[in-house]
Amino acid sequence: LTTIPGIALFYGGLLRSKNVLSMMTQVMVSFALVCVLWILYGYSLAFSAGNAFFGSFDMAMLKGIELTSLSGSFYQYIHVVFQASFACITVALIVGSFAERIRFSAVLIFAALWFTFSYLPIAHMVWGGGFLAMDGALDFAGGTVVHINAAVAGLVGAYLLGKRAGFGKEAFKPHNLPMVFTGTAILYIGWFGFNAGSASAANEIAALAFLNTVVATAGAILSWVFAEWALRGKPSLLGACSGCIAGLVAITPAAGTVGVGGALIIGLVGGVAGLWGVVLLKKWLRVDDTCDVFGVHGVCGIVGCILTGVFTSASLGGTGYAAGVTMGHQVGVQLFSVGVTVVWSGVVAFVAFKIAGLIVGLRVPEEQEREGLDVNSHGENAYNQ
């Protein structure tokens, strides 16, 4: 759960000072909204028996879960809140794509719709015994469910809302890099809960996931910083922080199944891939993805998912594939799971944004955008002179 304040600080520091509180408010309130929806029906639709795409309402309001009920070796209430944290951070990641121009009410409407019709079915398909799980997809801690899912939704939102006023003409620099660093550090700490905790036991897989997360993140920081140094002539703190996030994202689907050497390679590749995503791909897409959600979470999530299919091989130090599965087959399954997630999330996001637009409108008026969302949407200023 520390990832929630972490992402609020990380994104907040990347924005202009007139919009930092709007970002933090969007993250905090969407977190609360998703928590409530998770208890009402989210956990049930994701993790109860159902069909290939959705669970059922059998555990709505946690019906049938007793104080002593178990999920694996843990009490089931722990599983409920642990998985709630994944749902909350996934929705929080999305809002960075269209920051500084969206209506607060539109964020909440979108979040409720997208959570229900994209996050929950993807989580069920991958982790709840659904379609992709039956196909053999490997996603240890959320490459598809969290990162690709969120990144595609954010990209759709960035396109539909359009570019910020003055984009390409004015300098949009991060207003507080120490805040970005603090957010990165908190995210880094919280990520160990995601990755090691996804082993669902204090065992050798949790230890492997913990170590792999450290190694991959270190590799990604180095590859991003040195690549940036070569391209721009100077290494930057923002590059180091972005490399850290890129490494965390890339190792997420692989943390508990690849060896340490594989984790290092995934991190090194993820760092360079993330830099490519925010420098070149962003220009090719001609999109104003404010906090580079797709460039980091989308690109590195895809890279991590594909390389999971490679480095899970026992011959490369991983835990090995299911009986009879070859590397080529597993990579194909991974690519298919990526494709399903991209299409599903993209379609749901498009519809959800359109509905929010019809109900309240997506974008604030230009004069409010130029003055800042903090004062116009929330009646506050982050920095009072």
Positions of PLM-derived features:
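Glycine- and aromatic-enriched membrane alpha-helices
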Residues: 1-385
